[in-house]
């Protein structure tokens, strides 16, 4: 993502001003949409049968992530109809995500809020379960610092 843009261009980009060229905004918006699609597993194929296993990884992987007061984590498996229980990647906690330039990160957060709050229900986003979407918003609101107010409001 963001491969042809310079760090300076992205850092200085402000969607509400002329500092960011319209071409750069268009390119970034495409990349931001791709990141959001990835993060909500929009292209995930449904499981046709229950996945079972007894590996150590299957038991320890969910324990690596933060949990909210209800004991929920983005790393919790479903393994019946989909891989994870909640439609949001645990990569939201990654250093890579946190290192995104602020204008880009703000836009990714905004897209995720639109998708997970149910505001965006077109195409591939229509298949997402509203209860699981709300839970994902709540889990992140309880376990990640420095979230935008729109995220916190959508999680309530």
Predicted stretch roles:
Residues 23-156:
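A cross-kingdom marker for long, charged
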Residues 1-19:
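Single conserved hydrophobic/aromatic residue that forms the stacking wall/gate
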